[in-house]
């Protein structure tokens, strides 16, 4: 076994599994984010987001920017939710939240819908988990 593989194996073994309450809280935050958009419920979306949210999508090189990013603030996402941009009848919902990693204070989560994939970094603030960073990409239509 290579040294790098051994280090990864040891670090994975040293990380205790998150308890059921932590997993449920992280999943609830992910569902507040996506279900709030699908319901057009801006308050539900807002409670899932850090005030200094960094939501970005990779654009690549543009005429105005090398390594371009589409940037979105918490306020912009809440405004789009209020407008009902993703409002969808509940019987058509198709979304999944998959927790990739959890530490005492952070979590990495993958959200997938038919329209987009989000990769979240969540932070634990007291007993609340909220989305601090989101890197997303649209799915081909």
Predicted segments — roles?
Residues 65, 69, 129-132:
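Tryptophan-centered short beta-strand motifs
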Residues 10-43, 47, 51, 67:
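Short, low-complexity N-terminal intrinsically disordered segments enriched in polar/charged residues
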Residues 54-59, 67-116:
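Surface-exposed, charged secondary-structure patches
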Residues 59-61, 126:
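Solvent-exposed strand-loop boundary residues in beta-sheet-rich modules
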Residues 108-110, 115-141:
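Short beta-strand edge/turn micro-motifs at domain boundaries
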Residues 1-7:
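Sec-dependent signal peptide recognition
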Residues 24, 73, 137-141:
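Ligand-binding grooves and catalytic loops that recognize ribose/phosphate and carbohydrate rings
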């Amino acid at each position: 076994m290579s040294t790098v593989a051994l280090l990864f194996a040891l670090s994975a073994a040293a990380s205790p599994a998150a308890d059921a309450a932590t997993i449920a809280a992280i999943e609830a935050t992910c569902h507040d984010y996506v279900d709030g958009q699908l319901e057009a419920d801006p308050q539900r979306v807002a409670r899932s987001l850090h005030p200094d949210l960094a939501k970005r999508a990779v654009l690549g090189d543009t005429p105005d920017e090398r390594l371009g990013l589409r940037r979105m603030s918490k306020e912009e996402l809440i405004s789009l939710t209020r407008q009902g941009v993703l409002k969808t009848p509940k019987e058509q919902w198709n979304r999944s939240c998959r927790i990739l990693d959890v530490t005492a204070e952070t979590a990495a989560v993958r959200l997938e819908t038919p329209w987009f994939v989000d990769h979240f970094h969540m932070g634990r603030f007291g007993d609340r988990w909220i989305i601090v960073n989101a890197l997303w990409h649209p799915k081909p239509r």
